[in-house]
Amino acid sequence: MTSSSPNATKVKVAILLVNRQFIRSWIDSGLIKHLEANSNFEIHLFSDSEIHKRLPTSNDYKTVDLGEIQISKRTKHTVAMGLAQMSSRSRTFRFKLIRLFLPETLLFARHGNLRFKTVWFYKSFRRIIGNSLHNRMTLCYFFPPLRALINLYLKVLNEKPTLPKEISNGNFEWLIIPSASAIGYTTDFLEGANSIGLKTMIAIDNWDHLTGKSIYPIKPDYFTVMGKRCVEHAVQIHECDATRVLPFGLPRFDIYRKIEHNCNESFRVNKPRVLYCGFSLAHAEKQVVSSLANYFESRYGVGSIEVHYRPHPGPLPRYDGSTITNSNIEITSYKDLKRTAMPDMDEEFLNAILQADVVVGAPTTLILESLAIRKKCVLDLTNDGYHRTSAGNSALWHTHMIDLTDIKELPRGNTIDELHDQVDQMLQQPANCLHLDIENLYNTSEMLYRDQLLHFLLSAQHSKID
């Protein structure tokens, strides 16, 4: 590890954390400690009050409470208008706009008796009216004359976002902003940083951000993204300079680059195990999990194959009313998630994936994580007849999910029967692993994210890059 001399001036780096998940990605992962340990850097963590109270006490960095961060009106309108203007560049943007008005539920349920379908229609129609009233301003963004009036209003308003004085007066060389969703503070902070010549980096913390979470009216000096495919999305959707988009991976995914894969190694504890990974969007997955368990019990006998269900830690509401009544299904119960909103990526988390013979789920992050460590996976692409966002339909509308379904060798089930057959076939295969080419999405053979970031910052320090 390169170290500076005792008398060398340290590079001051400001890191802005305004999402609980970044505590896991940047602090719990050891990333910030790794940067600070280099001795070339002095790390300062800035956050709003809500996040600041959750930050652990450490000598590895200094923390600053910025209070409540206000977002400018210009940014609120500009980002929202951008989604409408750029909807032709990403299916996810279009689906996101559709879902602002149409509910998560289908207007007509495809299952149930007449009374159930009638009540379903009534509630879905009410949601359409409620959504339309709540998001009525978005309609203005679709019409150029109205956009022109809004832009004129914003010009007259003449807002000039500035950085908090704790950052602008801190003599920092870098402002790094981890980002996972469309939050307007990013644009305000980028504009404020540009006004004082502060170099900026947006560290994207997921794989769907550039395809559907936000737009960038003002771009940072650099992005870090999960993989090469994300670089392509940055160029094609956001018109970024490819040389400014760095495919370092994700801080929380470094754990998968540390695992040495062995095709002959089995992590099976007892019986063959199927793990179903829950979906964040509304999907009647409990019906799918129950059907898998019932299928294996009827085919091989009760208790012959374990079925484990790991719900998403932050799922959107489901409206189908399904419950799991089969007591043989093992359901993950999460500990207190108030601190980071996500489960710790500890040994228990890893073992949940490693000890499964087959991992099943919608095209979500956890499926990608399972593929990264060569687990046998099957995609759930079923449609439940209740939700607009059920797995099969979501896979057609989300650009990042299409990147996963484009891997033709990845087994999938478009119907419940197909899903049963595909999972059964994968269980019967003697191989413990599945080797698919996902390097364009996430490359496990690259250096750890924290090492790539460290090397980049050191190179920037020595070469004084812009």
PLM feature spans:
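Extreme N-terminal starter segment of soluble prokaryotic enzymes
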Residues: T9-V13
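Active-site and donor-binding regions of nucleotide-sugar-utilizing enzymes
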Residues: A14-R257, G314-L316, L366-I367
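Conserved catalytic-core segment of nucleotide-activated headgroup transferases in glycan assembly
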Residues: I27-D28, F253-R339, G413-T415
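Short active-site oxyanion
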Residues: E42-I43, I218-F223, E306, Q355-V358, ...
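Short acidic-hydrophobic, aromatic-tinged amphipathic segments that line or gate anion-handling sites
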Residues: V64-G67, T332-K335, T340-A341, D406-E418
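Donor nucleotide-activated moiety binding/catalytic core segment of transferases
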Residues: I167-S168, G314-L368, I373
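Catalytic binding pocket for nucleotide-activated donors in carbohydrate/polymer assembly enzymes
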Residues: P217-P220, T365-L441
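C-terminal alpha-helical cap of glycosyltransferases
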Residues: N443-D466
